[in-house]
Amino acid sequence: MQNTIRIIGIDPGLRRTGWGIIDTLGNSLKFVASGTVTSDGEMDLASRLCQLHDGLADIVHAHKPDEAAVEQTFVNKDAVATLKLGQARGIAMLVPARAGLPVSEYAPNAVKKAVIGVGHGEKQQIHMMLKILMPKAEFKGDDAADALAIAICHAHNRGGHRMRQALAG
């Protein structure tokens, strides 16, 4: 008998960190919740990171996921922006890890491929497929939609991902 696994997908960002929670049982996906944690751009960096930490910690505490998936970040031409995004991503990985959850990472093209079938697609294609895969899904904005897509990617890949982690030691 299979158990339902609750997955939180996290799309890290310093201004807005999207989160999406799904339940998966076998091949079935069920929307649970989604949203965005924001930080105040007028505050210093440390305070903004605290806001992201506290917001994500509240979500993890309220929804009690079993596993987490975080999108890997890309390097852009602005080194300072890349560094800040990396710090927000660190918070996105730290919060579920501190709650005892296994945390997996996925490249953006792997997320798109899992949801829309190709590694390069538009946001509207992701939104459309989310509604097809989970008709009751509700999301406001790209960040929450991306987070749900990350959770779906993990649901599709979690068995192989666990095996690779076990083999890596």
From Swiss-Prot:
Q: Does the keyword Oxidoreductase apply?
A: no
Give the UniProt entry's GO cellular component terms: cytoplasm; Holliday junction resolvase complex
Q: Give the record's keywords alphabetically.
A: Cytoplasm, DNA damage, DNA recombination, DNA repair, DNA-binding, Endonuclease, Hydrolase, Magnesium, Metal-binding, Nuclease
Binding of Mg(2+) 1 occurs at 11, 143
List the active-site residues.
Answer: 11, 71, 143
Cofactor notes: Binds 2 Mg(2+) ion per subunit.
**GO terms, molecular function:** crossover junction DNA endonuclease activity; DNA binding; magnesium ion binding
Q: Which HAMAP family match?
A: RuvC
Cofactor requirement? Mg(2+)
Question: What is the protein name stated in its UniProt record?
Answer: Crossover junction endodeoxyribonuclease RuvC
Cell compartment(s), UniProt: Cytoplasm
